[in-house]
Structures are given as structure tokens and as C-alpha cells.
Amino acid sequence: MKRSSQDSGSRSIPEDRKLYVVDSINDLNKLNLCPAGSQQLFPLEEKLQDISTDSGNGSRSLFLVGLIIVLIISLALVSFVIFLIVQTENKMEDVSRRLAAEGKDIDDLKKINSIIVKRLNQLDSEQS
């Protein structure tokens, strides 16, 4: 009696494994990962290898796209900085021209002031 219980226990484990394998194959067939009618796992392994190599190429292409985007953005920023430098230079030239013109005006005003002061001094000396 003891033997029959041990035998039935040892036989139930392989049967459970067989059921598990059959259920797994059925699940694969439902997911269309395994070709219809075949129960070999080699095509699945080939598909997994194809997926892994495609993901490597995808990451490379994603990296290249990201690199190109970063280069375009940096080129745009450099162009913008150059544009700002040119605009600042133009503004500085305008300011320096205005200062030079105002400096000439100030010199003219000083000359006129000195002429007026001389004339006033002459008038004061004539009156005294």
C-alpha cells in the first residue's frame, strides 16, 4: 500500500509537467508566436533573436536621431548668439556715433559760450 501511494505520487509529477507544457504550447498558439501545427520552440527562439537584434538597431537609430536633433539645436543656438553679437555691434556703433555728434555739439556750445563771455566782458569794460 505504501508503494502504490509513492508510485502514484511520482507519476503525478510528470503528468503535471506534461499538462503544463501542453498549456504553454496552447497559450503560444493563441498568441500566434508559434507557427500553426508545429510544437517546436526553435522558431520562437529565432523570433526572439530577431527582436533583440532589431531593438539594437532601433536604439542605434534612436541615438542617431537624438544626436542629429541635438546638433540642429546647438547650431540654431550658435546662429542666434552670432545674430545677437552682430546686433549689439550695430547698436554700439550707433551709440558711438551719437556720442561723437554730441561731443561736437558740446564743443560748439563751448565756443559760443566763450564768444558770449568775451563780448560781455568787452561791454563791461566799455561801460566802465
Curated annotation (Swiss-Prot):
The modification Phosphoserine is found at S24. Its main location: membrane. GO terms for cellular component: membrane. Residues 87-111 form a coiled coil. InterPro entries: DUF4577 (IPR028099). Keywords: Coiled coil, Membrane, Phosphoprotein, Transmembrane, Transmembrane helix. It is a single-pass membrane protein. It is found in: Membrane. It holds the Pfam family DUF4577. It comes from the Eukaryota. The keyword Transmembrane helix applies. The chain crosses the membrane at residues 65-85. This is Leucine-rich single-pass membrane protein 1. The gene is LSMEM1.
